[in-house]
């Protein structure tokens, strides 16, 4: 009985070491300080690539372009 508990413990610890973010595209996305989403990017972020072995989307914060009115030359 003790052996079965020990084997169950070893199996659960071994399976917890599997990394779901092991894809190369995910690593590149996180290195550029972007985020990965499985569905769609939030409305304030733009999709720039893939994550999770092309099953998700790599999202980057959208840059807001604010136009400053220029003074007219007289």
From Swiss-Prot:
Residues annotated as signal peptide: 1-23
Subcellular location: Secreted
Disulfide bonds: 29-58, 36-51, 41-59
Biological processes annotated in GO: defense response to bacterium
Tissue: Only expressed in epididymis (caput, corpus and cauda).
Protein keywords: Antibiotic, Antimicrobial, Defensin, Disulfide bond, Secreted, Signal
Repressor as UniProt keyword: no
Major subcellular location class: secreted
Record-linked InterPro entries: Defensin_beta-like (IPR001855)
Function: Has antibacterial activity.
UniProt family annotation: Belongs to the beta-defensin family.
Protein's name in the database: Beta-defensin 39
Gene symbol of the encoding locus: Defb39
